[in-house]
């Protein structure tokens, strides 16, 4: 081997080791059976399921069976100007959507924010179809539904979920950290808060009931610049409400997402005989006091699982959620699991 070859070899090794030392890794190839997603939610249009998730302009996948997925573009090619004007630091990476079909119209709710701040807003766009090949396919943005303002609001306007009650009333639950999960009544258009406003607290993590987050990413540590930089230690987010039998069930995610092998994300649930609560867990502890019956928690392969949605397939219910997968270098991947109910009416899944 010549000196030139040795020099080239050691140069290559140096670059590889340097890249490894800096934590550089390639994004995994698209896996149709377990695609990389954060914060999944899905709805069926015709014979096709469409999945929406966090991403630039809101990422979309499609599937005939909730099993094998393929990319289906994104919702926004042009970002809503109101969001750019309202939320400093928002540049199009749109979080935690929710999808709803009501009276022939699809409503897509979405979150505009930046990590660790509660200067945030929830918007909504509508469409007559989810099929991009249809001549009726066109997303029409309806603007801001609700926003949170730093220094004014001890809650965070992200992670929306809209539930239509049996009387036709629309309710939006939302929240992440700060004061926890809130519920507000929507007007008949499902695009604005109803007046007079009705607000209900649903879930929070009082001191001593949540994991200590004080030593996590700098972006979410307390900061003297004000409440916008102090989410507190109340790790709860991602509400999702379903009705089963005579009960309303509130699913939320507790503890820490997005930490790779150190993720502690989990899904818990409480139930109530009213959509407005109070929600309690199987032991009778209110979710407003940090209660929650565990539905899904981490294991050796998936240390953190959370941000769930529930869909009805006609043959039962499926829970969609994301998990940090050891086999993909702890990238967030989609899990789809059967939602089972025990004889006492409490849900569970098998990872």
Outline where the language-model segments fall.
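Positively charged n-region of N-terminal signal peptides that target proteins for export
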Residues: 1-5
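Bacterial N-terminal signal peptides
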Residues: 8-18
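Carbohydrate-active catalytic/glycan-binding domains of CAZyme proteins
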Residues: 20-351
């Amino acid at each position: 081997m010549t000196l030139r070859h040795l020099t080239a070899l050691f140069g290559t090794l140096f670059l590889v080791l340097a890249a490894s030392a800096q934590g550089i890794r390639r994004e995994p190839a698209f896996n149709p059976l377990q695609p990389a997603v954060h914060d999944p939610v899905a709805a069926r249009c015709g014979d096709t399921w469409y999945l929406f998730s966090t991403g630039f302009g809101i990422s979309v996948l499609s599937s005939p069976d909730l099993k094998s997925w393929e990319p289906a573009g994104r919702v926004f090619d042009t970002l809503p100007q109101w969001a750019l004007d309202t939320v400093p630091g928002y540049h199009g990476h749109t979080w935690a959507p929710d999808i709803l079909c009501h009276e022939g119209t699809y409503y897509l709710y979405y979150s505009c924010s930046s990590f660790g701040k509660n200067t945030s807003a929830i918007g909504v766009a509508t469409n007559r179809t989810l099929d991009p090949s249809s001549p009726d396919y066109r997303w029409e943005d309806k603007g801001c539904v609700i926003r949170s303002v730093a220094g004014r609001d001890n809650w965070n306007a992200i992670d929306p979920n809209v539930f239509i009650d049996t009387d036709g009333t629309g309710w939006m639950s939302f929240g992440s950290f700060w004061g926890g999960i809130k519920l507000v009544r929507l007007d008949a258009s499902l695009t604005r808060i109803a007046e007079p406003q009705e607000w209900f607290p649903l879930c929070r993590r009082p001191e001593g009931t949540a994991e200590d987050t004080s030593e996590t990413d700098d972006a979410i540590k307390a900061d003297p610049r004000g409440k916008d930089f102090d989410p507190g230690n109340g790790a709860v987010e991602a509400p999702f409400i379903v009705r089963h039998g005579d009960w309303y069930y509130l699913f939320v995610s507790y503890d820490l997402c997005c930490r790779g092998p150190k993720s502690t994300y989990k899904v818990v649930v409480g139930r109530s005989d009213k959509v407005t609560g109070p929600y309690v867990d199987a032991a009778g502890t209110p979710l407003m006091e940090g209660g929650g019956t565990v539905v899904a928690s981490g294991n050796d392969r998936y240390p953190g699982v959370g941000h769930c949605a529930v869909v009805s397939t006609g043959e039962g219910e499926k829970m969609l959620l994301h998990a940090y997968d050891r086999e993909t270098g702890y990238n967030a991947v989609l899990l789809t699991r059967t939602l089972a109910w025990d004889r006492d009416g409490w849900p569970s899944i098998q990872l």
